Amino acid sequence: TMGIALKYLGYSMNTDDIAALEAAKDLLISQKTQGIVKAYQVDETKDKMIAGEAAMGVMWSGDAQYAITQNPDLAYVIPKEGSNVWVDCMVIPKAAKNKTNAEKFIDFLCRPDIAKLNCEAIGYSSPNAGAIELMGADYQDNPVMNPTDEDVANCDTIHYLSDTLLLIYNALWADVKNAK
């Protein structure tokens, strides 16, 4: 939420500029006190959107894809100011006892036929070229699953926050949550 406010104001989601962070906090508090925002939520947003209890929400693309399948009156957009880009990663710990089986499992998930099934089951896009080909034009032309290069160009990959910056973010967010 803080990141989206930063993008709206023209800043990177990764800024450490205190004035920019304060401006984002002030924007969020203003939205809240004016009644523009019903609630700052994460997982509950898709359910509220599906039920028609909210007019707009910030959510992960997979949640949006699911919500649209449940309520065709919904649409998904990436704000012109941008958003965030994210990925889920698979790792094998150095001390893993079954490294060979872990590698086999990752290889299995990367098979195009399995990656296709996984994508269809979870509603999130796939970087697997073979899976994308198997899913066909409906998937390839879906802007929720495959945003344009122009949309992605305006987006930030969120970087690690230093311990100091994390404390600042937490304090600013507490101000937003406690605003009446």
Task: Show which residues each predicted segment covers.
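Short, hydrophobic alpha-helical packing/hinge segments within bilobed ligand-binding/sensory domains
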Residues: 45-48, 64, 102, 115
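Extracytoplasmic ligand-binding site segments that recognize negatively charged/polar headgroups
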Residues: 1-53
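A ligand-binding cleft/hinge motif common to bilobed small-molecule-binding domains
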Residues: 56-73
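Periplasmic-binding protein-like
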Residues: 3, 27-31, 70-94
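Conserved C-terminal helix/tail region of periplasmic/extracytoplasmic solute-binding proteins
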Residues: 47, 149-180
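Generic hydrophobic alpha-helical scaffold/packing signal
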Residues: 46, 50, 68, 93, ...
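Mature extracytoplasmic/periplasmic domains
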Residues: 84, 93-153
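Sec-exported extracytoplasmic/periplasmic mature domains
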Residues: 6-11, 29-33, 50, 54, ...
